[in-house]
Regions:
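Metal-dependent peptidase/peptidase-like ectodomains
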Residues: 197-295
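Alpha-helical metal-binding/catalytic segments enriched in His/Glu/Asp
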Residues: 127-129, 142-148, 152-203
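Acidic/His- and Gly-rich active-site-bordering loop/insert found
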Residues: 49, 75, 117-153
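Second-shell loop/turn segments in exported
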Residues: 28-36, 52-62, 114-118, 155-167, ...
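A non-catalytic alpha/beta surface segment that caps or lines the substrate-entry region
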Residues: 57-130
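Structural recognition of the beta-strand scaffold that forms the well-ordered cores
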Residues: 45-50, 89, 126-130, 139-143, ...
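N-terminal hydrophobic or amphipathic helices/low-complexity stretches enriched
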Residues: 19-82, 131-132
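Bacterial Sec-dependent N-terminal signal peptides
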Residues: 1-24
Length: 298
């Protein structure tokens, strides 16, 4: 995972405050926040989340619950308040029993009209914190899914899918950006939501539930997704990264280009505008609601 990616995003999210007070105390606060983004911190988060103790963080199982508690403790430690009344957004998913992979369903009230038969239930929980902005009722959501594939007892040797890249790397990124905001005390232009989704591997369940139930979804001005940023797609170009964004919002590419120049950040983004950006990660839940998005991926 590249520290430079996190620096670029933090600088972009603080852009509204920077435009108003470009020098002096504001700049010093930003640099204090940037100093908290370190390789050591990234490794510490990833090593814990991908540890065998969490048994692959399967949605609805003990490992993913431990991951959620770890994230929650980091939020409290940094003094980041919850977005809603509580940090946890609990919900249920239901799937009819099947020999193959289950197809999970979520409903806004978690009360599902189902026909008779055998069903499986998952108790899931998103973790949501927020730093209020100058426009408190407008939102930018920065998110990563916390779950992974769990275990496969049929595998010889090590049966655990640890999920260091997918997606301990993304969770680590969002945790570090959150800490940088908290340490800087910079007030962003819009409220920044730090979201950690449960159940992504089962069908984007956590982000789908949020986008269906958050009462101010029409005031979400953008979603920034971190999923699988821990491996080199092009090892011969270590600065390479894929930068998906909503094609109808070219400013999402412009701000990254501007900060790369201004701060001499060593990244080589592969800019990929999408005319209809859905995709196979949590960005899809927001795209279906018409929310413009960015997806960092390596």
């Amino acid at each position: 995972m590249r520290k430079t990616i996190l620096l670029a995003l933090f600088l972009a999210l603080t852009g509204g405050a920077r435009a108003q007070k470009a020098a002096g105390q504001q700049e010093a606060r930003m640099r204090r926040g940037l100093a908290t983004i370190t390789v050591e911190a990234a490794k510490a988060h990833i090593y814990f989340l991908a540890n065998d103790l969490l048994k692959g963080r399967k949605a609805g199982e003990e490992g993913s619950q431990l991951a959620a508690e770890y994230i929650l403790s980091r939020m409290r430690e940094q003094g980041v308040p919850p977005l809603l009344q509580d940090y946890g957004q609990s919900f249920e998913a239901v799937s009819k029993a099947t020999l193959g992979r289950p197809r999970w369903m979520v409903e806004p009230d978690s009360v599902l009209p189902v026909k008779s038969g055998r069903y499986q239930r998952l108790a899931l929980r998103n973790i949501l914190g927020a730093i209020r902005g100058q426009r408190p009722d407008e939102y930018i959501v920065v998110g990563a899914h916390l779950d992974h594939e769990g275990m496969n007892p049929l595998l010889e040797g090590d049966p655990i899918y640890n999920g260091a890249d997918d997606n301990a790397s993304g969770v680590s990124a969002v945790l570090q950006i959150m800490k940088a905001f908290a340490e800087s005390a910079v007030k962003p232009l819009r409220t920044v939501v730090f979201a950690f989704w449960d159940g992504e591997e089962e069908g984007l369940l956590g982000s789908r539930y949020f986008t269906e139930t958050f009462p101010n979804i029409d005031r979400v001005k953008g979603y920034i997704n971190f999923d699988m940023i821990g491996r080199d797609h092009k090892p011969e170009i270590p600065e390479y990264m894929v930068y998906f964004y909503t094609g109808s919002h070219p400013e999402y590419a412009d701000w990254l280009r501007a900060d790369l120049r201004r701060y001499a950040l060593a990244l080589q983004p592969d800019y990929r505008p999408w005319d209809y950006p859905v995709g196979g990660s949590d960005n899809g839940s927001f795209a279906r609601k018409g929310v413009p998005l960015v997806w960092f991926h390596t």
